């Protein structure tokens, strides 16, 4: 410790440029100036610790100044040393203890002065108490302080007496002196440490039982000694007495005495031996007692700490209570409050206030109102509304439930169109823009020209029957609040159409379209809507009661209202009159043309409307499992917010029940599509570019790297153009792209910043809508259930959706659709796929999903880029869904149309569009799927046009091989479409796809547009789609794919799938059913498949669905999820994306294989139960859960098994199947299933596959997936269309993977895709699988999911084919599974047929497969999922799922999708 040495070391080690001399001078200065204040001591102490590398120099100078200073200053230096010594360990500078230990003995001798010795002694005591230094060291210090100080000082003086010695010599002598105590201390440390170690060892090894045994032994020996003592005392011979010897007189006496003496001596000897033993055993007993003393003392200390902690806590609580009581006393009297609280039944707040606070009774209105606000983005109000919405989870739930009830009633009315109108009405009442209510009154006959009219015609009557469900008081309060809002906003009621005036789709479309722009500028969208609609208790009642009789006109009115509000003018009538005529569409188209972007949107809207009714219906159905017709209600919502291509498309899908309305819509959409499509076409490239540029220009989006097809495909351009209308209402949702495609912050709707979008639903309107939807949806316990509220929510959703769509679409018109589809659409389709209930729910879930999706998309704009790729996935999903059932086709068609209008159609030449349009009417269902396929592929094709889209499409496909495959299979219906697809990627492929979809639809009852193509497509598409869906389902619930071959029915009959659909949705026309079912299935697939699916699952429906569907996973955050739904638009985006990313993580963790294997392993049943989707969910959720809560995984499994089962058992005989579904909140209900499957699929496939996508897509999975998908963006689509089908061979592996569910099932029906055929949907999945799924997906997955994917993924992807089966059904699986269960069994029974075996590998072949397939295929038809939804809520309540909340950030999709930087979920919750 020489000064020189110290300086040298200081120089050498000093990080600063200062020299050793500078350090020493600084030390001298600091030590000299230190005072006894805490600031001075702690400051210098911190400085010393920071400069720990100079510890030796510091200690040396400390000692130097200790010697030179006066006693008071020495005390200060000791205080400093104490502070350093005690804090050095905590600050990783323990070296100071050793350094000071060297000098402390000498230092202690320098502070023996009575004035400071007591303080020094106290420091030593503290060190002793805190075990800073060993006891021996402390003793030595005390000795130095007291006695040795004198001798030590004498030695020092002796040193100083040699003037001849140099400073160095003196220093060495001092060091020698200091080293002695140091050595002693070190010795003592070594000797003391063992003691401490011994103590800790004793405490660790102490066994109370050993002590007890020792004590018992001692007691026994004591007893023995006592006994011997007594024996000795009873001896007649006193062995020790010599007197007895004197008494001996004769020999006899002597012998007797001798004998007695010997006995006595032997006993005495025994006694002595016993005592010896006791002495020997004593030490061990003593040691045991000592150890026990140490042990119990240590325990006592710990207990004391805990007890003190509790005491402290209790004191703090008491203090806090006192403070609160004091504050409470200062609060004014409730009566004296300047702003008295509203009464329990007071209307919800309006204007800038959150319309959700009074959601309870007003909820039906709120969604629409919120949607309207979104449509006419209210700068601050909207955001606040969203936030309020998020805040009022409970209220929202309550209102949702109410809406659900209402919806259920309307749903009960099995009128396809009716369901839609009801939804429209409900939506209107919710929105309180009540144009819908008036519309219901007015529009009932006009809009649903074909099916809708008939179904809707009873609307007036239906209203009253539903009165029981309606709270008139609440409605009145809502109306009054709406009125006040309108008054506040100063919106003229003149603009609103008379409630009694029926509006033709054209009228509403054109009229509303015109208002939409006006609405957009309006600061209070809600007010605008209200101003447009005369709100009367009757109107709201009709809306709330979901009068299904409200014919298309009513829907039209509402939808037009919503559209105008949404800036998505496609009227419900267009939606409703899918097959009706081109005139409404034309009108819409012309009107749309006025709003270029809108027109595209509208086109999509009609399509989506087409499905929308179904969607609404689905939601309604979800609401009431028994209401198969609820699908109609969604028509309006579909129109309203189905505008978002995805959402719209899926909503459309949900229109299975209202097949006619979709048909009507198809007609409208046809012409509308043809009109808007050109615009879209023209705008698509620019939109794509704009979106692409927008995303590119927005680092936030790129950072999020969400695989949002909308984002990628729609980019900013698509949103700007395609969403002009949407934006008007959607600007609030996400960053609004100016019409020219420049991202613009739309202050009107309080458009959040990109960060906000990431964090927030992105579009206040969307959020609000989603929240509303959620609120409305709360009725449905599960996400599906929640979605179920969609009737009310559906309306809200349409409005919301448009908002969200706007939000969503801003990221890519064309892509939007695809993306949305996966997200909302997919989930919806899933729901649709599931069954009536699912149908009902799907819309519900999907609409919510879509809303959320939109939010998410708002949030995920960055994701949009990825979504470009995903977009295709969406498309694919759509296609898959389409395949799944013709019923999905309408939605697909709608979606496709939307996509086309947005991006796909735009991408397609007018002729193609015409083809699509023409196809759309008859082939609407099939065509849209084709479109989806096209979109998926086409989305890619537009992607072709806008390169990223296709790539991503492919990537989307690839990541969602299942979905991709399905989509492609569906789109191309593999073989036929494949060729066509290649033929005219835009026109023919779409057409072909449509055709095949149409064919699917045709088998169901829709005439195929292209005879051969359609037929082939139908067969292939049905089979492929179904199989693909099954595959998806299987993939989703890979382990469960055996069980969950909901696909089997699908597979069982390519057309069987259609049949199943029909069976499942008897109320729907076969074609419509199939279409819707397909659509639903597709929706589900999309959801699960795509990022979007993830997002759908997790974003859109999943939020609720997640909440519910992912109950185990997410919904646990269940309630939060509701909030999240509203709040997490970005979150959803995140979530969806995040989910995918998460999924990637999870998928990676669980890896698709793992996820499926793990999740589905455990989720196998789950998947089976949940229908694959659940499995997927489980897989993906399970995986996370495994990570997070393996028990949850089991829980998930269990949850699915039990919870879902109970939830579903009523729907699904196979509780395991149901299991998966519950897990997939969404799967629970048809609606639920899609999200779940999406989750599964999205999670495992969608999320995981999408994860893949995200992984591949995000972590540049696109490299992998892009390599697959991107490699030949258009080709992959083509391949998907063609290759996937051609790749049916891979399906066999998937079949194998599928647990034979796919493989065997495949073989059964698989003409082109034999293996997949089994699943019906599997064929599609299979080809895609082979191409993307197996080749791409597997490769992608393997890439993404590495080995897991390779094997597992292969399996998974095979399973995608198989599990896809599960996923198809899984995707739809749970949902379908869930919904399908009742019908599924019958469907599945036959459909399952051969496929059933494989499908039911996990669950009973007949049952599970039937379930699975039925679920997968018809699952949505099954309303049973509805209960699931409810149970899901329970699931939401479940903690395991609660963990999902966190997982959602993972859903954020890990790094690739780190989507919103802040997952946004955590904060929301």
From Swiss-Prot:
Gene3D superfamilies: 1.25.40.90, 6.10.250.2560. The modification N-acetylalanine is found at residue 2. GO terms for cellular component: transcription preinitiation complex. Coiled coil: none annotated. PROSITE patterns: CID. Residues 434-445, 1272-1295 have a biased composition (Pro residues). One of its GO terms (molecular function) is RNA polymerase II C-terminal domain binding. The modification Phosphothreonine is found at residues 376, 536, 617, 742, 751, 782. Residues 19-149 form the CID domain. InterPro entries: CID_dom, ENTH_VHS, RPRD2_CID. Residues 419-430, 647-656, 761-771, 959-982, 1047-1073 have a biased composition (Polar residues). The modification Phosphoserine is found at residues 16, 374, 392, 492, 495, 498, 504, 583, 612, 633, 682, 684, 735, 738, 749, 777, 781, 788, 836, 845, 919, 947, 984, 995, 1086, 1117. The modification Asymmetric dimethylarginine is found at residues 1375, 1432, 1438. Residues 576-591, 777-787, 1159-1168, 1377-1390, 1400-1409 have a biased composition (Low complexity). Residues 329-445, 489-524, 572-594, 647-686, 716-867, 919-1013, 1033-1140, 1154-1183, 1204-1328, 1368-1414 are annotated as: Disordered. It comes from the Eukaryota. Residues 370-386, 397-412 have a biased composition (Basic and acidic residues). Residues 1169-1178 have a biased composition (Gly residues). Residues 387-396 have a biased composition (Acidic residues). Associates with the RNA polymerase II complex. This is Regulation of nuclear pre-mRNA domain-containing protein 2. The lineage of its organism: Eukaryota, Metazoa, Chordata, Craniata, Vertebrata.
């Amino acid at each position: 410790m020489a000064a020189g040495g110290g300086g040298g070391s200081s120089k050498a080690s000093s990080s600063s440029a200062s020299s050793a001399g500078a350090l020493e001078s600084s030390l001298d200065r600091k030590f000299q100036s230190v005072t006894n204040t805490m600031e001075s001591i702690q400051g210098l102490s911190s400085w010393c610790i920071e400069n720990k590398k100079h510890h030796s120099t510091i200690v040396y100078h400390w000692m130097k100044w200790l010697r030179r200073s006066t006693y008071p200053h020495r005390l200060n230096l000791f205080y400093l040393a104490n502070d350093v010594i005690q804090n050095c360990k905590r600050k990783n500078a323990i070296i100071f203890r050793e350094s000071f230990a060297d000098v402390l003995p000498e230092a202690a001798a320098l502070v023996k002065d009575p004035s400071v010795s007591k303080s020094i002694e106290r420091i030593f005591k503290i060190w002793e108490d805190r075990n800073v230094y060993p006891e021996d060291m402390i003793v030595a210090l005390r000795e130095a302080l007291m006695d040795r100080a004198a001798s030590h000082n004498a030695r020092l003086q002796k040193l100083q007496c040699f003037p001849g010695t140099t400073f160095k010599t003196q220093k060495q002598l001092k060091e020698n002196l200091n080293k002695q105590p140091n050595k002693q201390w070190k010795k003592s440390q070594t000797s003391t440490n063992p003691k401490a170690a011994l103590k800790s060892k004793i405490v660790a090894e102490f066994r109370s039982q050993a002590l007890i045994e020792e004590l018992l032994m001692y007691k026994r020996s004591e007893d023995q000694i006592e006994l011997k003592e007594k024996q000795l005392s009873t001896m007649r011979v006193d062995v020790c007495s010599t007197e007895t010897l004197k008494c001996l007189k004769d020999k006899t006496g002597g012998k007797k005495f001798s004998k007695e003496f010997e006995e006595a001596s032997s006993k005495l000897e025994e006694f002595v031996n016993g005592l010896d033993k006791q002495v020997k055993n004593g030490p061990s007993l003593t040691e045991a007692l000592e150890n026990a003393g140490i042990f119990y003392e240590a325990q006592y200390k710990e207990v004391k700490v805990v007890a003190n902690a509790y005491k402290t806590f209790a004191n703090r609580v008491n203090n806090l209570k006192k403070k609160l009581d004091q504050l409470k006393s200062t609060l004014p009297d409730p009566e004296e409050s300047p702003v008295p609280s509203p009464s329990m039944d007071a209307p919800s707040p309006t204007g800038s206030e959150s319309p959700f606070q009074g959601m309870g009774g007003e909820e039906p209105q709120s969604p629409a109102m919120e949607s309207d606000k979104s449509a006419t983005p209210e700068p601050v109000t909207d955001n606040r509304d969203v936030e309020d919405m998020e805040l009022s989870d409970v209220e929202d739930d309550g209102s949702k439930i109410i809406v659900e009830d209402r919806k259920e009633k309307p749903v009960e009315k099995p009128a396809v169109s009716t369901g839609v109108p009801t939804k429209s009405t409900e939506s209107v009442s919710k929105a309180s823009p009540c144009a819908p209510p008036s519309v219901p009154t007015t529009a009932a006959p006009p809009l649903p020209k074909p099916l809708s009219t008939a179904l809707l015609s009873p609307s007036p009557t239906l209203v009253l029957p539903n009165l029981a469900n309606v709270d008139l008081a609440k409605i009145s309060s809502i109306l009054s609040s709406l009125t006040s809002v309108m008054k506040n906003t100063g919106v003229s009621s003149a603009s609103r159409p008379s409630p009694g005036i029926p509006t033709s789709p054209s009228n509403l479309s054109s009229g509303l379209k015109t208002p939409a722009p006006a609405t957009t500028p309006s600061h209070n969208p809600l007010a605008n809507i209200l101003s447009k609609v005369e709100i009367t208790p009757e109107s709201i009642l009709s809306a709330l009661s979901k009068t299904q009789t409200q014919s298309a006109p009513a829907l039209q009115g509402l939808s037009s209202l919503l559209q105008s509000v949404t800036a998505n003018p496609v009227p419900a009538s267009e939606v409703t009159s899918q097959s009706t005529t081109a005139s409404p569409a034309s009108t819409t188209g012309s009107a749309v043309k006025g709003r270029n972007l809108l027109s595209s949107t509208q086109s999509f809207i009609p399509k989506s409307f087409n499905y929308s009714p179904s969607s609404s219906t689905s939601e309604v159905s979800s609401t009431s499992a028994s209401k198969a017709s609820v699908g109609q209600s969604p028509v309006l919502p579909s129109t309203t917010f189905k505008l978002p291509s995805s959402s719209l498309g899926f909503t459309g899908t949900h229109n299975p029940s209202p097949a006619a309305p979709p048909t009507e819509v198809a007609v409208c959409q046809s012409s509308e599509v043809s009109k808007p499509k050109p615009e879209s076409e023209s705008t698509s490239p620019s939109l794509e570019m704009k979106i692409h540029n927008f995303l590119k220009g927005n680092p936030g989006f790129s950072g999020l790297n969400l695989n949002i097809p909308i984002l990628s495909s729609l980019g900013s351009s698509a949103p700007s153009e395609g969403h002009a209308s949407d934006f008007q209402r959607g600007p609030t949702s996400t960053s609004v792209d100016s019409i020219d495609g420049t991202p613009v912050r739309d202050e009107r709707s309080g458009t959040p910043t990109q960060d906000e979008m990431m964090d927030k639903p992105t579009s206040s309107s969307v959020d609000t809508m989603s929240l509303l939807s959620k609120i409305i949806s709360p009725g449905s316990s599960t996400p599906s259930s929640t979605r179920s509220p969609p009737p009310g929510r559906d309306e809200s959703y349409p409005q919301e959706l448009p908002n969200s769509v706007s939000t969503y679409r801003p990221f890519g018109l064309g892509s939007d659709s695809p993306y949305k589809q996966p997200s909302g659409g997919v989930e919806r389709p899933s729901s649709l796929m599931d069954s009536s209930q699912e149908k009902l729910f799907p819309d519900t879930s999907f609409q919510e999903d879509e809303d959320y999706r939109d939010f998410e998309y708002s949030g995920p704009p960055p994701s949009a880029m990825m979504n470009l790729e995903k977009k295709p996935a969406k498309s694919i999903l759509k296609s898959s869904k389409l395949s799944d059932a013709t019923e999905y086709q309408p939605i697909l068609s709608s979606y496709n149309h939307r996509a086309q209008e947005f991006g796909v159609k735009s991408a397609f030449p007018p002729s193609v569009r015409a083809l699509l349009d023409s196809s759309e009417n008859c082939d609407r269902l099939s065509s849209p799927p084709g479109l989806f396929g096209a979109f998926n592929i086409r989305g890619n094709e537009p992607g072709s046009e806008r390169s990223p889209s296709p790539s991503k499409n492919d990537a989307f496909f690839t990541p969602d091989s299942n979905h991709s495959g399905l989509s492609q299979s569906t789109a191309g219906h593999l073989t036929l479409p494949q060729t066509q697809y290649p033929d005219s990627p835009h026109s023919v492929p779409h057409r072909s796809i449509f055709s095949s979809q149409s064919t699917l639809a045709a088998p169901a009852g829709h005439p195929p547009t292209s005879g051969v193509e359609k037929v082939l497509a139908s067969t292939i598409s049905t089979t492929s789609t179904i199989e693909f869906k099954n595959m998806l389902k299987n993939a989703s619930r890979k382990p469960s794919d055996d069980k969950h071959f909901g696909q089997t029915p699908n597979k069982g009959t390519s057309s069987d799938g259609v049949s199943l659909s029909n069976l499942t949705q008897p109320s729907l026309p076969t074609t419509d059913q199939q279409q819707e079912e397909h659509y639903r299935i597709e929706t589900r697939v999309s959801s699960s498949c795509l990022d979007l699916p993830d997002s759908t699952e997790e974003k859109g429906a999943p939020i609720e669905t997640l909440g519910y569907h992912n109950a185990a996973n997410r919904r646990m955050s269940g309630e939060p999820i509701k909030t999240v739904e509203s709040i997490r638009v970005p979150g959803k985006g995140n979530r969806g994306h995040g989910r995918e990313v998460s999924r990637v993580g999870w998928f990676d963790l669980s890896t698709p294989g793992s996820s499926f294997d793990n999740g589905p392993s455990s989720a196998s049943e789950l998947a089976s139960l949940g229908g694959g989707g659940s499995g997927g969910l489980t897989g993906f959720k399970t995986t996370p859960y495994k990570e997070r809560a393996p028990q949850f995984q089991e829980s998930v499994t269990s949850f699915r098994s039990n919870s879902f089962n109970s939830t579903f058992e009523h729907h699904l005989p196979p509780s395991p199947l149901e299991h998966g579904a519950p897990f997939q909140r969404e799967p629970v209900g048809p609606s639920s299933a899609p999200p779940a499957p999406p989750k599964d699929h999205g999670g495992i496939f969608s999320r995981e596959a999408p994860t893949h996508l995200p992984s591949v897509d995000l972590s540049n999975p696109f490299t992998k997936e892009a390599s697959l998908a991107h490699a030949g963006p258009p080709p992959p689509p083509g391949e998907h269309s063609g290759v996937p089908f051609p790749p049916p061979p891979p399906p066999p592996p998937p079949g194998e993977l599928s647990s034979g569910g796919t493989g065997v099932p495949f073989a059964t029906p698989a003409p082109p895709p034999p293996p997949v055929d089994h699943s019906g949907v599997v064929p599609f999945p299979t080809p895609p699988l082979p191409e993307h799924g197996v080749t791409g997906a597997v490769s992608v997955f393997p890439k993404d999911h590495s080995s897991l994917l390779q094997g597992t993924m292969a399996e998974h992807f095979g399973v995608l084919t198989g599990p896809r089966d599960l996923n198809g059904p899984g995707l739809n699986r749970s949902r379908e599974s869930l919904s399908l269960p009742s019908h599924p069994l019958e469907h599945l029974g036959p459909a399952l047929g051969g496929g059933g075996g494989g499908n039911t590998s996990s669950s009973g072949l007949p049952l599970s497969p039937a379930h699975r397939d039925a679920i997968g295929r018809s699952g949505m038809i099954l309303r049973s999922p509805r209960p699931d939804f409810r149970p899901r809520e329970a699931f939401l309540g479940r903690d395991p799922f609660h963990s999902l909340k966190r997982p959602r950030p993972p859903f954020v999709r890990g790094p690739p999708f780190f989507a919103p930087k802040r997952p946004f979920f955590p904060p929301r919750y």
